[in-house]
Protein backbone atom coordinates (compact mmCIF):
# COMPACT_ATOMS: atom_id res chain seq x y z
CA UNK A 1 0.00 0.00 0.00
CA UNK A 2 2.78 2.38 1.02
CA UNK A 3 4.70 1.40 -2.11
CA UNK A 4 1.63 2.07 -4.26
CA UNK A 5 1.24 5.50 -2.64
CA UNK A 6 4.89 6.26 -3.34
CA UNK A 7 4.41 5.26 -6.96
CA UNK A 8 1.32 7.44 -7.18
CA UNK A 9 3.31 10.38 -5.83
CA UNK A 10 5.99 9.70 -8.44
CA UNK A 11 3.41 10.01 -11.20
CA UNK A 12 2.11 13.31 -9.84
CA UNK A 13 5.63 14.68 -9.42
CA UNK A 14 6.64 13.67 -12.95
CA UNK A 15 3.56 15.27 -14.48
CA UNK A 16 4.06 18.40 -12.38
CA UNK A 17 7.52 18.77 -13.89
CA UNK A 18 6.77 17.77 -17.48
CA UNK A 19 3.08 18.77 -17.81
CA UNK A 20 2.44 15.65 -19.89
CA UNK A 21 4.20 12.31 -20.22
CA UNK A 22 3.92 9.09 -22.16
CA UNK A 23 3.22 5.78 -20.45
CA UNK A 24 6.72 4.41 -21.00
CA UNK A 25 8.23 7.50 -19.35
CA UNK A 26 6.05 6.96 -16.29
CA UNK A 27 6.73 3.22 -16.11
CA UNK A 28 10.46 3.92 -16.41
CA UNK A 29 10.25 5.72 -13.04
CA UNK A 30 9.37 2.43 -11.35
CA UNK A 31 5.61 2.84 -11.53
CA UNK A 32 3.59 -0.28 -12.31
CA UNK A 33 0.92 -0.38 -15.01
CA UNK A 34 -1.65 -1.21 -12.33
CA UNK A 35 -0.76 1.90 -10.31
CA UNK A 36 -0.97 4.03 -13.46
CA UNK A 37 -4.43 2.63 -14.23
CA UNK A 38 -5.59 3.29 -10.65
CA UNK A 39 -4.33 6.87 -10.81
CA UNK A 40 -6.47 7.43 -13.91
CA UNK A 41 -9.51 5.71 -12.38
CA UNK A 42 -9.25 7.78 -9.19
CA UNK A 43 -8.96 11.04 -11.11
CA UNK A 44 -5.45 11.84 -9.88
CA UNK A 45 -4.26 12.03 -13.47
CA UNK A 46 -5.99 12.42 -16.82
CA UNK A 47 -5.54 10.30 -19.94
CA UNK A 48 -5.33 12.66 -22.92
CA UNK A 49 -5.20 9.92 -25.50
CA UNK A 50 -3.73 6.45 -25.76
CA UNK A 51 -0.45 6.36 -23.83
CA UNK A 52 -0.38 10.09 -22.97
CA UNK A 53 -1.20 11.55 -19.53
CA UNK A 54 -1.37 14.87 -17.66
CA UNK A 55 -2.62 16.23 -14.33
CA UNK A 56 -6.34 17.09 -14.40
CA UNK A 57 -5.70 20.70 -13.36
CA UNK A 58 -2.72 21.23 -15.67
CA UNK A 59 -2.52 24.70 -17.17
CA UNK A 60 -2.01 24.17 -20.89
CA UNK A 61 -1.40 27.00 -23.33
CA UNK A 62 -3.03 27.34 -26.74
CA UNK A 63 -0.23 25.38 -28.39
CA UNK A 64 -0.46 22.37 -26.08
CA UNK A 65 -1.84 20.27 -28.96
CA UNK A 66 1.56 20.60 -30.63
CA UNK A 67 3.18 19.15 -27.53
CA UNK A 68 0.75 16.22 -27.62
CA UNK A 69 1.57 15.50 -31.26
CA UNK A 70 5.30 15.79 -30.62
CA UNK A 71 5.02 13.29 -27.78
CA UNK A 72 3.16 10.83 -29.97
CA UNK A 73 5.36 11.36 -33.07
CA UNK A 74 8.90 12.05 -31.76
CA UNK A 75 10.46 12.01 -35.25
CA UNK A 76 7.98 14.52 -36.65
CA UNK A 77 8.48 18.25 -37.23
CA UNK A 78 5.68 20.81 -37.02
CA UNK A 79 5.38 22.31 -40.49
CA UNK A 80 3.34 24.15 -43.14
CA UNK A 81 0.28 26.12 -41.94
CA UNK A 82 0.73 24.94 -38.35
CA UNK A 83 4.29 26.31 -38.21
CA UNK A 84 3.17 29.59 -39.83
CA UNK A 85 0.37 29.95 -37.26
CA UNK A 86 2.69 29.09 -34.35
CA UNK A 87 5.10 31.85 -35.42
CA UNK A 88 2.19 34.32 -35.61
CA UNK A 89 2.46 34.80 -39.37
CA UNK A 90 -1.16 34.01 -40.26
CA UNK A 91 -4.54 34.33 -38.59
CA UNK A 92 -5.82 31.24 -40.39
CA UNK A 93 -5.58 28.45 -37.83
CA UNK A 94 -5.40 25.01 -39.47
CA UNK A 95 -7.96 22.46 -38.31
CA UNK A 96 -5.27 19.78 -38.36
CA UNK A 97 -1.73 19.74 -37.03
CA UNK A 98 0.62 19.60 -40.02
CA UNK A 99 3.64 17.45 -39.30
CA UNK A 100 6.56 16.40 -41.51
CA UNK A 101 8.13 12.95 -41.38
CA UNK A 102 10.82 11.23 -43.43
CA UNK A 103 10.10 9.82 -46.88
CA UNK A 104 10.33 6.24 -45.59
CA UNK A 105 9.12 6.73 -42.01
CA UNK A 106 6.14 4.76 -40.73
CA UNK A 107 2.98 6.85 -40.99
CA UNK A 108 1.43 7.29 -37.53
CA UNK A 109 -2.31 7.21 -36.90
CA UNK A 110 -3.74 9.33 -34.08
CA UNK A 111 -7.34 9.37 -32.91
CA UNK A 112 -6.69 12.80 -31.38
CA UNK A 113 -5.55 15.39 -32.24
CA UNK A 114 -6.21 15.37 -35.99
CA UNK A 115 -2.98 15.44 -38.00
CA UNK A 116 -1.95 15.95 -41.62
CA UNK A 117 1.22 14.13 -42.64
CA UNK A 118 3.74 15.56 -45.12
CA UNK A 119 6.75 13.55 -46.27
CA UNK A 120 10.10 15.30 -46.79
CA UNK A 121 13.35 13.90 -48.10
CA UNK A 122 16.33 14.05 -45.74
CA UNK A 123 17.77 17.48 -46.65
CA UNK A 124 14.40 19.20 -46.34
CA UNK A 125 13.36 17.25 -43.24
CA UNK A 126 16.36 18.36 -41.16
CA UNK A 127 16.69 21.91 -42.50
CA UNK A 128 15.67 24.77 -40.21
CA UNK A 129 14.42 22.73 -37.25
CA UNK A 130 14.04 24.67 -33.99
CA UNK A 131 13.02 23.34 -30.57
CA UNK A 132 10.36 25.33 -28.73
CA UNK A 133 9.33 24.54 -25.15
CA UNK A 134 5.57 24.03 -25.04
CA UNK A 135 3.87 22.56 -21.97
CA UNK A 136 7.23 21.23 -20.79
CA UNK A 137 7.95 19.51 -24.11
CA UNK A 138 10.74 20.47 -26.56
CA UNK A 139 8.68 20.57 -29.76
CA UNK A 140 10.53 20.51 -33.11
CA UNK A 141 9.09 23.28 -35.29
CA UNK A 142 10.46 24.65 -38.53
CA UNK A 143 11.90 28.16 -38.36
CA UNK A 144 10.09 31.14 -39.84
CA UNK A 145 12.30 31.12 -42.94
CA UNK A 146 11.92 27.35 -43.50
CA UNK A 147 8.15 27.45 -42.95
CA UNK A 148 7.85 30.22 -45.54
CA UNK A 149 9.99 28.30 -48.04
CA UNK A 150 7.81 25.21 -47.57
CA UNK A 151 4.65 27.27 -48.04
CA UNK A 152 5.84 28.72 -51.35
CA UNK A 153 7.28 25.40 -52.52
CA UNK A 154 4.02 23.51 -51.93
CA UNK A 155 1.11 25.56 -53.36
CA UNK A 156 -1.18 22.51 -53.29
CA UNK A 157 -0.73 22.29 -49.51
CA UNK A 158 -0.65 25.97 -48.55
CA UNK A 159 -2.78 28.49 -50.43
CA UNK A 160 -0.66 31.13 -52.17
CA UNK A 161 -2.59 33.93 -50.46
CA UNK A 162 -1.67 32.45 -47.06
CA UNK A 163 1.99 32.16 -48.10
CA UNK A 164 2.07 35.80 -49.25
CA UNK A 165 0.30 37.01 -46.09
CA UNK A 166 2.78 35.07 -43.95
CA UNK A 167 5.76 36.46 -45.86
CA UNK A 168 4.50 40.01 -45.37
CA UNK A 169 3.93 39.38 -41.66
CA UNK A 170 7.43 37.94 -41.22
CA UNK A 171 8.97 41.04 -42.75
CA UNK A 172 6.82 43.66 -41.00
CA UNK A 173 7.12 41.91 -37.63
CA UNK A 174 10.83 41.28 -38.20
CA UNK A 175 10.43 37.59 -37.39
CA UNK A 176 13.22 36.86 -39.91
CA UNK A 177 15.44 39.05 -42.07
CA UNK A 178 14.95 39.18 -45.86
CA UNK A 179 18.37 37.57 -46.30
CA UNK A 180 17.44 34.67 -44.00
CA UNK A 181 14.17 34.17 -45.83
CA UNK A 182 15.87 34.31 -49.22
CA UNK A 183 18.58 31.84 -48.18
CA UNK A 184 16.04 29.31 -46.95
CA UNK A 185 14.06 29.73 -50.17
CA UNK A 186 17.19 29.07 -52.23
CA UNK A 187 18.20 26.06 -50.13
CA UNK A 188 14.70 24.58 -50.22
CA UNK A 189 13.92 25.13 -53.88
CA UNK A 190 11.37 27.92 -53.43
CA UNK A 191 13.36 30.97 -54.54
CA UNK A 192 12.02 31.16 -58.10
CA UNK A 193 8.45 31.37 -56.82
CA UNK A 194 9.09 33.55 -53.76
CA UNK A 195 11.56 36.01 -55.27
CA UNK A 196 9.13 38.48 -56.93
CA UNK A 197 7.03 38.75 -53.77
CA UNK A 198 10.01 39.16 -51.45
CA UNK A 199 11.68 41.75 -53.69
CA UNK A 200 8.45 43.75 -54.03
CA UNK A 201 7.90 43.79 -50.27
CA UNK A 202 11.47 44.76 -49.40
CA UNK A 203 11.62 47.48 -52.09
CA UNK A 204 8.34 48.93 -50.83
CA UNK A 205 9.41 48.58 -47.22
Where are these regions (language model features)?
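Charged, compositionally biased N-terminal leader segments and the immediate start
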Residues: 1-3
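Nucleic-acid-binding surface
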Residues: 6-25, 29, 35, 40, ...
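A short, conserved structural fragment
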Residues: 43-50
